[in-house]
C-alpha cells in the first residue's frame, strides 16, 4: 500500500487500534535508536519519523501518523549475532566483563550472551572457556548505565 502524500510519524500509541491501515517498519537494533529522519517501510513507502527525541523504538510499537486511521508498526529486524554460552556461570560472567570493557553491546539471557557478529570479537572469544555459535535473531541489547534512552 503506497501513498503519494508524505507520511509523517509523530508519536507512540499505547494500544493497537482495531481499525486502520498499518505499515510495517523493520529496523535493526541501531536503527531503533534513531527517532528522526526518512525511512522506507517494508513495502517501500517513504515515511518521515518526527518522534520526541527521548526514547527508543521497540519491537511491536505502534506509531501514529499525520493521516487519520493510518499507523506504523515497528518490527525488530533479525540480525547476525554471536551466541555465547558456557557450562560455567563464572566463565560467562568473565566473558561479559571483558566484552563490557570493550563497550560491546550485549543482550543477556538466562545462560546466554548475544552480541553482534564481529570478526575481532569472535577471535577474542576463542580465548575464553565459552561456546560460541553464529545465529540470526532479533537483537535487544541492554541499555547502558549512562544511556539517555
Swiss-Prot record:
Show the GO MF annotations. nickel cation binding; unfolded protein binding
Give the UniProt keywords, A-Z.
Answer: Chaperone, Cytoplasm, Nickel, Nickel insertion
Q: What is this protein called?
A: Urease accessory protein UreE
* Lineage: superkingdom: Bacteria
The family line of this record is: Belongs to the UreE family.
Biological role stated in the UniProt entry: Involved in urease metallocenter assembly. Binds nickel. Probably functions as a nickel donor during metallocenter assembly.
Predominant location category: cytoplasm
Record-linked HAMAP family = UreE
Q: Which GO terms describe its biological process?
A: protein folding; protein-containing complex assembly; urea metabolic process
S-S bridge residues: none
TM region(s), chain numbering: none
Which compartment or compartments is the protein found in? Cytoplasm
What would be one Gene Ontology cellular-component term for the protein?
A: cytoplasm
Amino acid at each position: 500500500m503506497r501513498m503519494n502524500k508524505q507520511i509523517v510519524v509523530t508519536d507512540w500509541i499505547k494500544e493497537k487500534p482495531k481499525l486502520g491501515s498499518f505499515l510495517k517498519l523493520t529496523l535493526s537494533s541501531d536503527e531503533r535508536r534513531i527517532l528522526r529522519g526518512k525511512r522506507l517501510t517494508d513495502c517501500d513507502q517513504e515515511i518521515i519519523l518526527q518522534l520526541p527525541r527521548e526514547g527508543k523504538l521497540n519491537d511491536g510499537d505502534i506509531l501514529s501518523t499525520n493521516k487519520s486511521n493510518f499507523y506504523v508498526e515497528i518490527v525488530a529486524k533479525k540480525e547476525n549475532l554471536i551466541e555465547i554460552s558456557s557450562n560455567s556461570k563464572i566463565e560467562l560472567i568473565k566473558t561479559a566483563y571483558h566484552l563490557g570493557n570493550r563497550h560491546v553491546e550485549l543482550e543477556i539471557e538466562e545462560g546466554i550472551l548475544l552480541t553482534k557478529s564481529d570478526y575481532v570479537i569472535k577471535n577474542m572469544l576463542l580465548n575464553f572457556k565459552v561456546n560460541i555459535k553464529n545465529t540470526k535473531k532479533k537483537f535487544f541489547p541492554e541499555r547502558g548505565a549512562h544511556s539517555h534512552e
